[in-house]
């Protein structure tokens, strides 16, 4: 079942040496975040830069902008056609958004893609800043309210930040108990799937000695809102959703800050913008970036087949 109005989610990400762009249509079915539901429309071998991304996505984004301008999309229905009201969203990590929307880089003082909060203010307490205005020209005419707080990167990033400052020996023993291994990448201890397994283990095994247990438990509770299946259960009583959601976010935020953990960018998205997004769009994980992330492995194989091994990072768009 396609959500009504028709919703199209665009996404872009770099995996290995290949940058990919595409879209998917969220559907009310199990495994809606499967990579088989993701339509890969543009791929090039090379880094994430504004110039390369604009070249690689020019035709793709022009088509999307025409939908945004019209507000609907003509679709075949039965023996004829019908114009369907259409909403377009974009999901990407905090490194991709500046290249697509021209916002400040995630390492800037005004690091948030959605507001102009100052980094020092965010470090002191949960807060937000004036709503950001996108400067012309921009590649996509998507309103800021339709930029997804990326669920996979947020939950994974917050989990890994806690693990980074946890006792190494305890962490090693816990990984053994959960039957997971640390990622080979220095920038990320656990992948999204293993990170979720770890959070579940912490919650279901209260007898284990775990650093930052309360915060990890609160993070697990937050992660349930990112699960497509769990979200349906959590929102059966629709009237209570805003209060319960805000309560979960506030409890997690307070625990994180009480533990004096680093106030990273992803924490700000949760504290200042996540509740508004979920309430406005009636969902979170269903708009997530899992599909394109799962394509990275296939993309690496495709890159080798299309471009050959050891190619220079010249723009090659398919």
Specify the residue positions occupied by each region the protein language model found:
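A structural signal for the principal folded core domain
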Residues: 1-318
